[in-house]
Amino acid sequence: MTVVIVKPGYAPYEAEINGLHEMQEVVGGTIQAIYPFEDRAAVACNDEGILLGMPYNRSVPGGYGGVFGPFFVCGLGEEDFCSLTAAQIKAYKKEFRCAEILIGATGNTPITMKVQPKAVGSPGQEKSRNDHPGRE
């Protein structure tokens, strides 16, 4: 299925993931789904991200607070997850385009500072936007 993957500190990117094992690899463990959006989409994240000490990732709307560790946004079918539409991919890449640094919280509302994300290169190769060719 086609999803948008969001890693702490990095720009979101489109990817294909298939099956429970790959979903768990993306989030680093047991999956928890939350439904902060008005359209048929979900955030799938690590159920124990904060307990495992995963880094803060992004704020999510709808009173859910923030997500710790990597997550992906996927579509919702009748009974399970499914691919996002092209419009949803564009919308969620825009929604999560800025990385965030957690400064504090008021109740369940995170107080964050939005920062420029690091760019994600080809799969498995993550580069900062400040990396220059020939200086690797």
What does each model-found stretch correspond to?
Residues 43-50:
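Short helix/strand-capping turn motifs
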Residues 63-86:
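Helix-rich interaction surfaces within compact, conserved domain-sized segments
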Residues 35-38:
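Catalytic phosphate/metal-binding cores of nucleic-acid and nucleotide-processing enzymes, i.e., regions
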Residues 1-11, 135-136:
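Short, extreme N-terminal segment that most often corresponds to the first beta-strand
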Residues 31-33, 45:
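Short, surface-exposed polybasic-aromatic patches that bind anionic ligands, especially phosphate groups
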Residues 119-136:
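Non-Sec secretion/translocation targeting segments of pathogen effectors
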